[in-house]
Amino acid sequence: MTDKHSVKNSDFFEAKERLGLLTVGDPGAHDKLHVTDTVLISLARKVDNKIKQHPKLKHKLVGMRNKVRGAKYRIVSIAKSTTSTSAPVAEKATPNITQMIQGVSFPSVKHPDVSIIIPAFNKAEFSAACLKSIATKLSSNGPTFEIVLVDNGSTDDTIKLKSIENLVYVQNKENLGFVGGCNSGFVKAKGKYVIFLNNDAEVTEAWLTTLYDTIEKDPSIGLVGSKIIYPNGVLQEAGGIIFKDANGLNYGKFDQAESYQYNYVRDVDYCSGASIIIRRDLMEKFGGFDTLYQPAYYEDTDLSFKVRREGLRVVYQPLSVIYHIEGGTAGTNTNTGFKKFQVINKEKFSKRWRETLESSHVAEQDHYLGRDRSGNKLALIIEEAVPTPDKDSGSVRMVAMIKSLQSLGYKVTFWPNNLTKLSPYTDNLQQMGVEVVYGNIDFMQFSRLYGHAYDLVIMSRPEICARYINICKTLYTNAKLVYDTVDLHYVRLARQAEIEVANAEQLNEQSKWYELLEKGLMQRVDATIVVSNKEVELLQSEGVAGTIAVISNIHSIKEGAYKVGFDNRRDIVFVGNYAHLPNRDAIRWFMSDIFPNVNKKLPDVNLIVVGANLPDDLAKELKQKNINLRGFVSDTELATILTSARVFIAPLRYGAGVKGKIGQAVEYGLPVVTTDIGSEGMHLKHEVSCLEANKAEDFAKSITRLYADKSLWNKLRKNAKESLADHFSISVATKSLEKLLKD
């Protein structure tokens, strides 16, 4: 960036330096706040003006603007503290450490899962608060742990902490710094894993469990770090980035801790030693933190690089949260004290890892790419909302597609059109390593900043593709653009018109409109995804050109359910999301025209109706004898229902695509009676792997026949199981997706 376009870094560093000198209760803080606030306001105006004047430089300036906003936030917090009626620090009584730790104790554990090592030099009140947070926040149901407190030659009341029950207290004669303190604590540690935690931190309820589970469940991970937040709630670090020049960035510093980009699991360059967990054998192999970086700084970065050199991953876990004062023990001035080693050790680190930095790290202006250490290609998926796989089969398919992309080496960003964070579904994706966008985020702005970085964009459903395709074609210049139909809407509407005669004219008009829309979109993208071979054949017969791939629903056989045979099952079950109109029509047709005949033949058999979004009027219609109306159920409850039922019905009279509900029934060893619409695209054959009937009378006869014929029942489910494995596995979908992306 030329001088003409630049904003002086000196302005920001002056503001930051002044801010670092502020302390709560400082009698002169008001004057300092005024000066600092003035500097920041001036800087903020400069940055905003440069963004307006030079939009191409926006991505380089946004980070500085966020820092300014964060600094302003800290000023407000400090201002509130300095205007309180509390006495100045000098007049306050010294904290009573004995009172602070009253009632604090830790369990006695012979072979702990985790050793938590806390180095401390003076600031006994910090250490006491840290230990109290561990004692009060952590659940006894989590991993077992021991606490190793390293007194690094303290001269205050830190020694009083030694009285805490079952605390392992290591006392050094002198201050060995963070490196020496941690290493002396590690000698005493007995845990399978080791956590290093700063004494000026306080933990949260999920802090330990999420750190432990992340590393314990994935052998490819060597080190995991926490999300670090300032006491006022502002983000301090969401993983760290190291640039080619060895400068580091605490990603997200001074931004909002709940912003979407800081809340998904991802590989990072390093995690701050303020809160990390590492495998014990690795720490032993490395001989602890490297004494090259004695007394402190860059030792945690060096450790992360060594972990990665061993072929293991360094991962950021946002659900593990600590509140950290930062500099509470070491201070913040890089010209004096231990803090000066931040500059000295950077040079040592740069010299040791120069080749790695040059070959594998990005320049500072490319921090968007540098925030994710995986180096994977970037895929953007745009869909109406976050998938809810326990409510509809389309969501199951979407989650499976995301997993397939990840297995093919893509890092996935998921953009829900409604930009709504939906728990627990958003959280589940984030824990899979998916960046889920939510909040007041503008797609045009996002695309201008980052569109060039993406290799793939998948737009799901015609309405979504129509809304986003122009921006994507303009700004995602390096990406393959893919339209995922989910199903052919125009086909479904045409079939609905055949059933709903009263609305036929309107439905046919809608069908024609969707046909023009869908086929038009197919001509504007690089490839189209459909869910069945029948849809490929239809489109090709209608003259649609271009790449068309089949990525159907994904299913996995539940072998345990197949151990429950004919004699141990009873009742009939229907599953569907009733926001989908074909499902409403299906259950109404079944109740009015089919079930009465079934009930005559099988009076003791119940119909179990399962599914979300059941309208009140339909629910009233279903409140009849022999009908068990369950509505929405959890995955566990649904598994129990499907494992205990004898016959699954799918009386669909219109629709398109493939039917996830049928595939799910087969997963659980449940033979199916359906229509030709229901079996379409499912690779099922009448009398071989299912029973088909399109007339009400025939449908009822098929149910009663299958319900009573054990031999037929066993044959259908055996053949359906083989067909499902051949056509709907995750490996089949992944191969199809891989071929699509290579073409």
Give, region by region, the residue ranges found by the protein language model.
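A conserved acidic beta->alpha catalytic loop
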Residues: 133, 149-160, 174
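Conserved catalytic-core segment of nucleotide-activated headgroup transferases in glycan assembly
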Residues: 390, 394-399, 403-404, 414, ...
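Conserved donor NDP-sugar-binding/catalytic core segment of glycosyltransferases
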Residues: 201-243
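Glycine-rich, basic loop-to-helix element that forms the pyrophosphate-binding segment
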Residues: 171-189, 199
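Short, flexible, basic/aromatic active-site loop/helix in glycosyltransferases
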Residues: 243-269, 284
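Acidic donor-binding loop of glycosyltransferase active sites
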Residues: 192, 454-455, 526, 643-657, ...
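Short hydrophobic beta-strand element within catalytic cores of glycosyltransferases
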Residues: 661-665, 671-675
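Non-catalytic membrane-proximal stalk/linker segments that position and tether the catalytic domains
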Residues: 5-112, 332-395, 401, 427-432
